[in-house]
């Protein structure tokens, strides 16, 4: 019987595979976020005309999902392996299935289904056509073709593939609890993450200072606006991410009502839309440096008309 891949070997295998497909291997973005989609390597790069192919691991924090380390499959923080390709390759689904084969999962021997599940992120004004990928009855991946990001229509279309690494590893290693996943030889997932899970859950549900978080949200929102007034897209987006995480902490604490919740989401969305528009304008001002010369000259000429 062959040795099962460790968590980090799964990551290395996916990195090598998508590197071979022409993706840049980015590093996790150093700001709290609820999903890999919110990284600027996806959110910003999915808009505008320039090509972009990237893959990266993204730790994703969802305070309301914390369970004190007591639930075998629900986590405050989980890991996503994010792949974004723009324009979307025509064979992206075939490439995905090939990536599973590299992990030792033969599509001919397993029940792999693409279940329609169109995607939407109201807090960033983003949406797309999507599918959940189910492997023998368990969701392991979200597949999305972005139609709108930051309130802007995407052209060309970006394909996003988001692997749920904990679920994938649980399946490959045949364990029922994420905490039993072998991260590396001789080191279990729980030995690294169960204490942080407990502490972050306790903080999110019991300890966080609601008044401070409310004040911080207002300050982060204001600072994002100040950065945008100066045309500073990336610092502004950092504060949008901070607003989002702060809201998630408030939500986990039960500090916002249903009515207030919609208002906070709208405030984040409005900022994200301005960031998106400003980013596209910035790339145009820079002359769309990632485009090939012929396309770049043609597009700039059209924009000038």
From Swiss-Prot:
Recorded GO MF terms: ATP binding; catalytic activity, acting on a protein; glycine-tRNA ligase activity; transferase activity
Record-linked InterPro entries: aa-tRNA-synth_II/BPL/LPL (IPR045864), Gly-tRNA-synth_heterodimer (IPR006194), Gly-tRNA_ligase_asu (IPR002310)
Catalytic activity: tRNA(Gly) + glycine + ATP = glycyl-tRNA(Gly) + AMP + diphosphate
EC number(s) given by UniProt: 6.1.1.14
Entry's localization field: Cytoplasm
Lineage: superkingdom: Bacteria
A cellular-component GO term for this protein: cytosol
GO biological-process terms attached to the record: glycyl-tRNA aminoacylation
Keywords noted in UniProt: Aminoacyl-tRNA synthetase, ATP-binding, Cytoplasm, Ligase, Nucleotide-binding, Protein biosynthesis
Subunit details: Tetramer of two alpha and two beta subunits.
Family listed: Belongs to the class-II aminoacyl-tRNA synthetase family.
This protein's name: Glycine--tRNA ligase alpha subunit
Lineage: Bacteria, Bacillati, Bacillota, Bacilli, Lactobacillales
